[in-house]
Amino acid sequence: VGDTVAIAQRTGAMTISNFEIHNWLLAQGVEKAHPMHIGGGKDFPFGRVKLTIAHHGSALPDGSYGGNPAGFLLTLEGKRIYHACDTGLFYDMKLIGEDGLDVAIVPIGDNFTMGPDDALRAVKLLEPKVVIPIHYDTFDVIEQDPQSFAARVEEQTQSRCVVLNPGESYRL
């Protein structure tokens, strides 16, 4: 959950999470929070959000159980974005990409999530137009070369890979 509480309190943004994290966020003083669960989708004023499976652990900063980990499938202004979050590779990613994806955001760090090889396999299952690698280089055991990953994606798939530096953004 990282800086979620501080950001939500500072900006008044609504958080969207599984039910267990939702309850924890409310207990931390977050005022606008919406609970969901895997497989569920909901239309919001900004677009549609659907929670997908993810294969990972889920503990909150205080050590309490964070519920089932999840990814997010977003539909915003007609664009479909899949944020895999912390996960390992799973074959059902093919289903997530079936209706077309404009962007897939996938971890490449290895050790705690899928690494570059499995992330490349995920891209082949998802078939997005654009891939953005995440969850790497924040500490020693997940150091990766995102440019090498990007080159492999563009050599072996029809996807374009966009490597973002901290603080950068990507516009659809």
Across the structure, where does each feature detected by a protein language model lie?
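Metallo-beta-lactamase
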Residues: L74-K129, I134-I142
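Short, well-ordered coil/turn elements that cap or connect secondary structure elements
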Residues: R10, A27-V30, F44-F46, L76, ...
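Binuclear metal-ion centers of metallo-dependent hydrolases, dominated by the metallo-beta-lactamase
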Residues: M14, H22, L26-G41, L120, ...
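A general structural detector for well-ordered alpha-helical segments in enzyme core domains, enriched
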Residues: I7, N68-A70, D92, D118-A122, ...
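Core dinuclear metal-dependent hydrolase active-site scaffold
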Residues: M36-E98, N165-L172
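Divalent metal-coordination and catalytic microenvironments
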Residues: D3, T15, V49, D86, ...
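Short glycine-/acidic-enriched loop or helix-start segments at secondary-structure transitions
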Residues: V1-T4, L25-A27, P61, D92-K94, ...
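Active-site metal-binding motif and surrounding structural segment of the metallo-beta-lactamase
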Residues: V1-L26, K32, E98-I105, E127-P128
